[in-house]
Amino acid sequence: MSKFWSPFVSDLVPYVPGEQPKLTRLVKLNTNENPYGPSPKAIDAMRTALTDDLRLYPDPNSDLLKHAVADYYKVQPSQVFLGNGSDEVLAHIFHALFQHDAPLLFPDISYSFYPVYCGLYGIDYETVPLDEQFQIRAEDYARPNAGIIFPNPNAPTGCLLGLDKVEQIIKASPDSVVVVDEAYIDFGGETAITLVDRYPNLLVTQTLSKSRSLAGLRVGLAVGHPDLIEALERVKNSFNSYPLDRMANVGGAAAFEDREHFETTRNKVIESREALVEQLQGKGFEVLPSAANFIFARHPRHDAAALAAKLREQGVIVRHFKQQRIAQFLRISIGTPEQHQALLEGLSDL
């Protein structure tokens, strides 16, 4: 703390990102990165873009990538917003659309950046408890609010809310913006982007960090009614008119165009997830149903924090949360079969 800090900054509780260890020999299963590389076509596109043109600013509208996203999801470019990772997209959403008199609603166990944004922008919020099975209950959101946001699949639980229930939430709050945060949707769910033409209050966010294997590039997007997109563009252009560099634009566009690589790697992650679930259940773990590229598991006889520490001693990093309802769970990112073998060897004496 410094005497130069404003009281506002002194009171901020920032987001704590997952550990990015410097030692490369560690088995890293803690931040939900894709174990398989990006599309070779995306890599080639970025190599081709390494020219003298890097002296020039990138396209502020990111039209190349915007059109690639629009073509992929069969929407109009005017319905697409792009940002420097979905976290920046979400920050602009909170700033542009959630500063109202009534509270914002989101699950009590959810993405931990949501309350950080509320603190940053002075947004009142209420958390809505998940049920005993850690599922979102659509009916619990049918109450006065100034906006709703939830991840689907949820993070860190991995549980999926069916599209019919998503639509139920949207219908119940026609005068509020409903944001469906779909960072993990490609690993087992149906996107709500198919609903945006029916509901002008719906905004869907996604990222290229997970299923497109481009976490190091930082590309996020939102799809919704042009009026909502315009609000985000106003905030963006009052903050940073060039959020995506040339590499992100061409690499992201190529990643969307390479459907074969996307489907192949996505399917490998899903197959590995189901195999790991079965293996952990064989060791006595309770594993929540996951539609993401991670699983959420607890063991009835072993403390989760102690298990995480034990695994780390053996070179395997997983994520442990201290939040009360989930303090006995571990979140384990889906890796390669070799990484899973290292994990299971670390748990061999259970």
UniProtKB/Swiss-Prot annotation:
Pfam families per UniProt: Aminotran_1_2
Modified residues (N6-(pyridoxal phosphate)lysine): K210
Source organism, top-level taxon: Bacteria
Cofactor(s) the record lists: pyridoxal 5'-phosphate
A single MF term (Gene Ontology): histidinol-phosphate transaminase activity
Pathway recorded for this protein: Amino-acid biosynthesis; L-histidine biosynthesis; L-histidine from 5-phospho-alpha-D-ribose 1-diphosphate: step 7/9
GO biological processes: L-histidine biosynthetic process
Catalytic activity as recorded in UniProt: L-histidinol phosphate + 2-oxoglutarate = 3-(imidazol-4-yl)-2-oxopropyl phosphate + L-glutamate
Gene3D superfamilies for the chain: Aspartate Aminotransferase, domain 1, Type I PLP-dependent aspartate aminotransferase-like (Major domain)
EC numbers: 2.6.1.9
Quaternary data: Homodimer.
Similarity section: Belongs to the class-II pyridoxal-phosphate-dependent aminotransferase family. Histidinol-phosphate aminotransferase subfamily.
Name recorded for this polypeptide: Histidinol-phosphate aminotransferase
